[in-house]
């Protein structure tokens, strides 16, 4: 087959030694990362005191704005990964760092930890790339065919990304070992690969580097689930933007990438190349050099004459042709691939996918009402860069472009993500996300219910949210301020206030200070998510 890990910009991807948990940053374009302006501390409220020997004046605390740790890449204070996980043997090594087997101390469960050396992240673009990759992994985590993200940690020397351990090895290795797959096996794998593409596109992400090396098998079993693991070249899709930087790996790169004018359709092309290899054991466009490969891709002649193609079904060849159509506007979409007769008629039905958005909505409905209100405040202040993927999801679900999502639109949107919920379960999620109770989910409510928890870890977001409730700048959220907020958001009564105070007020002074508020937002004040059976 030749070397299938060449890059369009470099023959050495720097990723192969990392056991599928790759390092892709050297070929990625610079992305714009939001900068945050930290709010100034509020002026202390004016308080007049009458001096008394018996009652000395009490000065209310002033909540200082957060002070970020200098030179942090993740934008939050240093966090020692070794306080949660013990790092074990090396699994692989790449240009930017090392992947280790790690064990969660509390549970004994094993994961993979990619430790990226900060010394090697020399440029601003390198740091932005790491941030974006983590953001996309967090955004997509929770899907059946996407590796589960467990957490990101940063210390003085490294950024550590902990994720699901896939013990079955690379799909690429199995392809080489077998030479080719049966049509049934190829259809199963193709469905999983295209399902990843479909979910990425629905959630506003373009992968840009689909290839067998970037898929790992969850276990060593023959029918192990396939997991996409490497999102180092992925970007959030910007509506109307055509991308021009050449990225990807030589055999799998789409012709429009070489012409420097492309969109998300490139992922379907790459999946089509994978399907061709699954069926025949060789790539459709082959040459001794990268230039030769690129010339063959631009020429676009697909060989269906050599063995084993005469024995391959016409339906399979039809799907390959449609996925490898030169004109991206005429190329089949990922959703259409999944409906193609070769996949649809030859496959048993999939198990329901508990999608990322669904998982977060389940957690959201279990939160206390102060946390829901605070999330809404944070959501309304997030910038475009932070919510690109969720914005695309909202647009996809809001089919009538009304600016709100109805029950029917929510049900249809979740179905597109692969979830098979009953009407009662969808209604429960609808009621949870519909904070103001008007029967539909507006844009801010949707972002509030579905944004990933990592957004809450930024101190500046928590500080702004605390200031929103602390109207008199006293350094505390009082019962009166809580009551005012609940009335404004139409979210509760006196009993609700009592419940919130008792849950969050850990020092039992009848008020909520900034530390208690942060503890609640970072997890201390959230109940266990309810299970939908």
Curated annotation (Swiss-Prot):
Region (Autoinhibitory domain): 348-378
Binding site for Ca(2+) 1: 398, 400, 402, 404, 409
Protein's name according to its UniProt entry: Calcium-dependent protein kinase 19
Superkingdom of origin: Eukaryota
GO molecular function, one term: ATP binding
Positions that bind Ca(2+) 2: 434, 436, 438, 440, 445
Keyword match tRNA processing: no
Ranges annotated as biased composition (Polar residues): 1-12, 24-38
PROSITE patterns named among the record's database cross-references: EF_HAND_1, EF_HAND_2, PROTEIN_KINASE_ATP, PROTEIN_KINASE_DOM, PROTEIN_KINASE_ST
Domain (Protein kinase) ranges: 85-343
Lipid-modified sites (N-myristoyl glycine): 2
GO cellular component, one term: nucleus
List of residues binding Ca(2+) 4: 505, 507, 509, 511, 516
Function field: May play a role in signal transduction pathways that involve calcium as a second messenger.
Active-site residues per Swiss-Prot or TrEMBL entry: 209 (proton acceptor)
Any one GO biological process: intracellular signal transduction
Sequence positions that bind Ca(2+) 3: 470, 472, 474, 481
Domain EF-hand: residue ranges: 385-420, 421-456, 457-492, 497-527
EC annotation from Swiss-Prot or TrEMBL: 2.7.11.1
């Amino acid at each position: 087959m030749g070397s299938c890990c060449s890059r369009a910009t470099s023959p050495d991807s720097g990723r192969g030694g990392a056991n599928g948990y790759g390092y892709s940053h050297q070929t990625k374009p610079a992305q714009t990362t939001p900068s945050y302006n930290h709010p100034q501390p509020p002026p202390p409220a004016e308080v007049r005191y009458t001096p008394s020997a018996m009652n000395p004046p009490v000065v209310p605390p002033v909540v200082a704005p957060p002070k970020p740790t200098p030179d942090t890449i993740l934008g939050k204070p240093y966090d020692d990964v070794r306080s949660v996980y013990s790092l074990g043997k090396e699994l692989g090594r790449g240009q930017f760092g090392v992947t280790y087997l790690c064990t969660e101390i509390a549970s004994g469960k094993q994961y993979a930890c990619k430790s990226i050396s900060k010394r090697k992240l020399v440029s601003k673009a390198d740091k932005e790339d790491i941030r974006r990759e983590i953001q996309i992994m967090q955004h997509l985590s929770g899907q059946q065919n996407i590796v589960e993200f467990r957490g990101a940690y940063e210390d003085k020397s490294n950024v550590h990304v902990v994720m699901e351990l896939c013990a079955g090895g690379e799909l690429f290795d199995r392809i080489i070992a077998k030479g080719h797959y049966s049509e049934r096996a190829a259809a199963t794998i193709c469905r999983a690969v295209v399902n990843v593409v479909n979910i990425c596109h629905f959630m506003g992400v373009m992968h840009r580097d689909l290839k067998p090396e970037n898929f790992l098998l969850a276990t060593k079993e023959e029918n192990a689930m396939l997991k996409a693991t490497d999102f180092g070249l992925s970007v959030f899709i910007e509506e109307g933007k055509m991308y021009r930087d050449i990225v990807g790996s030589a055999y799998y790169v789409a012709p429009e990438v070489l012409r420097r004018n492309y969109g998300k359709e490139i992922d379907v092309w790459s999946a089509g190349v994978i399907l061709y290899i699954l069926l025949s054991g060789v790539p459709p466009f082959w040459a001794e050099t990268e230039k030769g490969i690129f010339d063959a891709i631009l020429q676009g002649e697909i060989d269906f004459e050599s063995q084993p193609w005469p024995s391959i079904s016409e339906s399979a060849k039809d799907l390959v042709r449609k996925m490898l159509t030169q004109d991206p506007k005429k190329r089949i979409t990922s959703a259409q691939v999944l409906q193609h007769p070769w996949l649809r008629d030859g496959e048993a039905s999939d198990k329901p996918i508990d999608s990322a958005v669904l998982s977060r909505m389940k957690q959201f409905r279990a939160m206390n009402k102060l946390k829901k209100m605070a999330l809404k405040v944070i959501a309304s202040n997030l910038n475009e860069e932070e919510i690109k993927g969720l914005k695309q999801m909202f647009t996809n679900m809001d089919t009538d472009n009304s600016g709100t999502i109805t029950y029917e639109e929510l049900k249809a949107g979740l179905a597109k993500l692969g979830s098979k919920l009953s009407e009662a379960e969808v209604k429960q999620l609808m009621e949870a996300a519909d904070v103001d109770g008007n029967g539909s989910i507006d844009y801010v409510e949707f972002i509030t219910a579905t944004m990933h928890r990592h957004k809450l870890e930024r101190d500046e977001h928590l500080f702004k949210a605390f200031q929103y409730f602390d109207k008199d700048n006293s350094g505390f959220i009082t019962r009166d301020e809580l009551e005012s907020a609940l009335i404004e958001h139409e979210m509760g009564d006196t009993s609700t206030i009592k419940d919130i105070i008792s849950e969050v007020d850990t020092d039992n002074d009848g008020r909520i200070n900034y530390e208690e508020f942060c503890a609640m937002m970072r997890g201390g004040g959230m109940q266990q998510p309810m299970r939908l059976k």
